[in-house]
């Protein structure tokens, strides 16, 4: 046996022993296996390289087996080994980006399992070499129910399907491999390739095909069913696919490089490039980074049958900038890695001007920060995922960016303003890295994006400035109240014209502006925060009032709950977008925990108000971007400005109220209480049985057996009405729907508006929906909107809308949203979508796939959506893991540091 085989088998033996001994501890096992993988891949690459020199490796000198660089170079030049190249790159990038804790190792090992199976299969086929013989014992899937589900799908995948390739194009949003009997299959999440499609319009399909996810694709899709829990669940099978970048995306990319072209999908150059990308599994950036000889070969192949070259004229220009590392190269790297029409349009200068600092590309100057420091800056209107960046941009010499990114994410994602030096153990010379980062910033950005420190705690300067400015402004307006305020409220109440039947709310109203001109009202879910807003609005009935909230559903809720005159209601985004300065006597902001620091400082700078009411719950889902001001205000603003509502009104169910309190306080006996009161249930068919007409199923994820898509398919199959297909989605009369964000029907149909399909008519190029919506409108409301009012009752209205399909729709840059269905089927919805809504019955599904994503705020928000019945579907193991991991972030370190800094 040659030395190379000895080395490979020695590594394999080590992996085998680890799996054999440590199956019950996936984190520890993953850590040990990951330590072996780089060496494993590199020696496999050498074996293939040496074999390519001579089919018989027995006569090859031993020193050849040490040529790791030659081995890696060989596999990079052969499309068969693209998976091996990708695996090696991932191992390298993971080592530089992750601390190899057991938890991180476990995540990575699950991601890499697919590649290990490919190695096993290739070495057996090519050399009859048996490796990874017990890899099937690695505990990939810890849920037996999921295994049964996927086995039934695999039975369908193994059948031969013949279906036509779609004319429609799709973007692949997520590819999740799953494994049955050492074979690899994929669960694909995809959506229409349309600039206006909502991120919530996701479809799930299954395939044996390893589909490239960088670009738009065409799919051959077949409808089928599998039997789950005695019910036939509709599924989609992808039997074939092809790369099909939208021609308008190539046109836009070319414009950025000052090459005006008009590509058609019928062009030979286009067709051969799409075919080559699929066959070689090289994305456009991979092609651009090939050595000159290989690049010219690809170019010659793709353009062989073309009378005129269009695409490669653009790619030649692009390659020259990227290979020579000229300014603009990182923007081009990312855009060529992910051709996406919407993203590219956002980068262009609105007047079509050149950016001199980025090699005269036709992009806006706002692209410069990303080009210079891509790991800690965003493109215009787009925040790239870290793994996409790691794939297309080298990290060498960018450690300062990775450190800054970690500090930034700790604030934006974890809500921590200050990050301790102890959290940066994987970085060396932190002080020097921060100096480098700060000096590389554009001088005008150093005060906002720069990193500062308080002792051994680091922070983003702009984040700290925002929260300090907010708190100082609130402290300033809390110094004095309204003279004779309490007496005036007492007098108003004594007239009997307005009744407040809650003693606590009456006392708050009497004192809220006695000593302060700002009132912060905190309250748990269902304690009547909206009612309190209504009381205050009615007392100030003659004064001009502006009521703001972050979302359309929250604004709509205020409109329903507030009956006072002289009120104007707006979303925060709409208010800030308006250029006119708006004055008011009373400014009220609802759901303050969802308002980011940056938005709040803008509101305080723009608004001209005399009194301010801030309302929210710090235990519900927080701001998407960094927003900790409302939590910190509770300990930094005068106590005379702080009020708390404690008595719940959403429900009178004592066990349910006790549960809310226990989750809110994260009490020690939470698991026992959930069990004793039958709130915890194992996942079974009962989740699909409707217990109440006003019922919702809440999930955190869209894919998987118990994801939103599958639950909707299950429950829709119970609907006896005829199914009407539009694209890959089925609709039925009687389906509940939830509207997405759409400018086409705004403000009548808004994000999160609930409705029900009352009629469907399908034509060749048009589908017409009649939707009953839970709001009453009149004919004047829909003037100038593409809506028809069919009927209206005391509590609802039925509106008619049309969605169209045009030939070669995705070829062109179609800005129209009349091709997009503006709602999603909503038997089940996401927990985030449910915020601000309430139901008689809530069923919450938490699987082991998403247990790490369940935070204290997410769990609390989910369980407080119900007024009567609650069931949480999870395994005992998942329940234990979630309860043990959720924590209440008290932000004590942030509070302590800020107290010292505030005036």
What are these regions, as identified by a protein language model?
Residues 2-216:
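Extended low-complexity, intrinsically disordered and solenoidal helical-scaffold regions
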Residues 127-135, 140, 145, 149-482:
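N-terminal accessory nucleic-acid engagement/regulatory domains that precede
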Residues 473-480, 539, 561-564, 606, ...:
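Conserved, well-folded catalytic cores of nucleic-acid-processing
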Residues 484-497:
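Conserved adenine-nucleotide phosphate-binding loops and their immediately adjacent elements
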Residues 497-515:
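Pre-Walker A adenine-sensing motif
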Residues 510-676:
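ASCE P-loop NTPase helicase motor core
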Residues 519-562, 615, 671-715, 719, ...:
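Conserved RecA-like ASCE P-loop NTPase motor core of nucleic-acid helicases/translocases
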Residues 527, 566-569, 639, 651-654, ...:
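Core RecA-like ATPase module of SF1/SF2 helicases and allied nucleic-acid translocases
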């Amino acid at each position: 046996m040659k030395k190379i085989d000895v080395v490979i088998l020695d590594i394999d033996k080590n992996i085998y022993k680890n799996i054999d001994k440590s199956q019950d501890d996936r984190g520890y096992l993953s850590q040990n296996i990951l330590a072996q993988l780089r060496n494993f891949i590199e020696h496999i690459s050498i074996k293939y390289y040496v074999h390519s020199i001579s089919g018989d490796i027995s006569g090859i000198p031993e020193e050849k087996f040490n040529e790791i660089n030659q081995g890696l170079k060989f596999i990079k030049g052969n499309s068969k080994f693209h998976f091996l190249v990708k695996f090696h790159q991932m191992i390298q990038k993971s080592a530089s980006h992750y601390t190899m804790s057991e938890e991180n190792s476990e995540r990575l090992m699950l991601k890499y399992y697919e590649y290990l199976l490919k190695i096993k299969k290739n070495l057996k086929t090519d050399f009859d070499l048996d490796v990874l013989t017990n890899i099937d014992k690695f505990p990939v899937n810890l849920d037996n129910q999921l295994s049964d589900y996927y086995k039934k799908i695999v039975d369908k995948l193994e059948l031969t399907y013949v279906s036509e390739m779609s004319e429609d194009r799709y973007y692949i949003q997520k590819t999740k491999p799953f494994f049955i009997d050492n074979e690899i299959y994929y669960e694909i999440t995809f959506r229409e390739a349309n600039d206006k499609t909502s991120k919530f319009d996701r479809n799930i399909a299954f395939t044996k095909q390893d589909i490239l996810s960088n670009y738009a694709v065409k799919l051959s899709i077949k409808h089928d069913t599998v039997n789950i829990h005695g019910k036939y669940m509709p599924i989609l099978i992808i039997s074939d696919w092809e790369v099909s970048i939208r021609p308008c995306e190539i046109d836009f990319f070319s414009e950025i490089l000052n090459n005006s072209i008009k590509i058609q999908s019928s062009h030979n150059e286009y067709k051969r490039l799409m075919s080559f990308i699929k066959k070689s599994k090289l994305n456009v950036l991979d092609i651009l980074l090939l050595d000159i000889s290989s690049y010219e070969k690809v170019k010659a192949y793709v353009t062989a049958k073309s009378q005129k070259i269009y695409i490669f004229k653009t790619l030649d220009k692009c390659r020259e900038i990227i290979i020579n590392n000229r300014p603009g190269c990182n923007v081009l790297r990312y855009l060529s890695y992910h051709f996406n029409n919407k993203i590219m349009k956002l980068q262009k200068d609105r007047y079509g001007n050149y950016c001199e600092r980025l090699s005269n590309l036709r992009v806006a100057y706002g692209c410069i920060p990303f080009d210079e420091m891509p790991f800690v800056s965003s493109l215009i209107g787009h925040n790239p995922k870290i793994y996409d960046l790691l794939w297309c941009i080298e990290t060498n010499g960018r450690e300062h960016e990775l450190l800054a990114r970690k500090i930034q994410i700790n604030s934006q994602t974890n809500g921590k303003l200050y990050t301790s030096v102890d959290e940066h153990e994987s970085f060396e010379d932190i002080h020097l890295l921060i100096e480098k980062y700060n000096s590389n910033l554009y001088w005008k950005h150093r005060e906002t994006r720069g990193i500062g420190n308080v002792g051994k705690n680091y922070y983003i300067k702009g984040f700290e400035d925002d929260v300090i400015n907010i708190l100082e402004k609130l402290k300033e307006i809390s110094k004095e109240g309204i003279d004779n305020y309490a007496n005036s409220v007492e007098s108003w109440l004594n007239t009997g014209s307005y009744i407040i039947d809650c003693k606590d709310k009456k006392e708050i109203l009497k004192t809220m502006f006695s000593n302060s001109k700002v009132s912060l009202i905190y309250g748990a879910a269902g304690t009547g925060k909206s009612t309190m807003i209504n009381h205050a609005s009615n007392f100030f009935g003659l004064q001009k009032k502006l009521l703001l909230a972050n979302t359309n559903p929250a604004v709509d809720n205020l409109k329903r709950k507030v009956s006072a005159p002289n009120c104007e209601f707006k979303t925060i985004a709409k208010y800030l977008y308006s250029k006119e300065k708006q004055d008011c006597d009373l400014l009220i902001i609802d759901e303050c925990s969802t308002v980011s620091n940056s938005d709040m400082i803008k509101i305080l700078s723009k608004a001209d108000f005399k009194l301010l009411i801030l309302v929210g719950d710090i235990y519900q889902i927080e701001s998407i971007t960094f927003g900790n001001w409302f939590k910190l205000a509770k300990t930094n603003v005068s106590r005379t400005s702080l009020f708390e509502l404690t008595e719940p009104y959403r429900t009178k169910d004592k066990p349910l109220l006790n549960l809310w309190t226990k989750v809110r306080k994260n009490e020690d006996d939470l698991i026992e209480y959930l069990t004793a009161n039958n709130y915890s249930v194992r996942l079974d068919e009962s989740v699909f049985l409707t217990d109440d007409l006003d019922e919702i199923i809440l999930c955190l994820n869209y894919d998987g057996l118990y994801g939103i898509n599958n639950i909707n398919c299950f429950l829709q199959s119970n609907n006896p009405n005829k199914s009407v297909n539009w694209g890959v989605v089925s609709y039925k009369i009687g389906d509940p729907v939830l509207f997405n964000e759409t400018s086409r029907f705004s403000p009548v149909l808004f994000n999160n508006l609930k409705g029900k399909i009352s009629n469907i008519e399908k034509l060749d190029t048009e589908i017409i929906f009649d939707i009953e919506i839970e709001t009453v409108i009149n004919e004047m409301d829909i003037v100038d909107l593409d809506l028809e009012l069919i009927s209206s009752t005391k509590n609802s209205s039925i509106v008619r809308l049309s969605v169209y399909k045009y030939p070669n729709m995705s070829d062109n840059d179609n800005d129209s949203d009349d091709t997009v269905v503006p709602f999603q089927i909503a038997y089940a919805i996401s927990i985030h979508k449910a915020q601000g809504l309430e139901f008689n019955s809530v069923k919450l599904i938490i699987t082991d796939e998403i247990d790490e994503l369940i935070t204290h705020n997410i769990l609390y928000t989910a369980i407080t959506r119900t007024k009567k019945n609650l069931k949480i579907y999870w395994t005992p193991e998942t329940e234990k893991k979630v309860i043990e991991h959720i924590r209440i972030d008290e932000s004590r370190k942030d509070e302590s540091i800020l107290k010292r800094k505030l005036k």
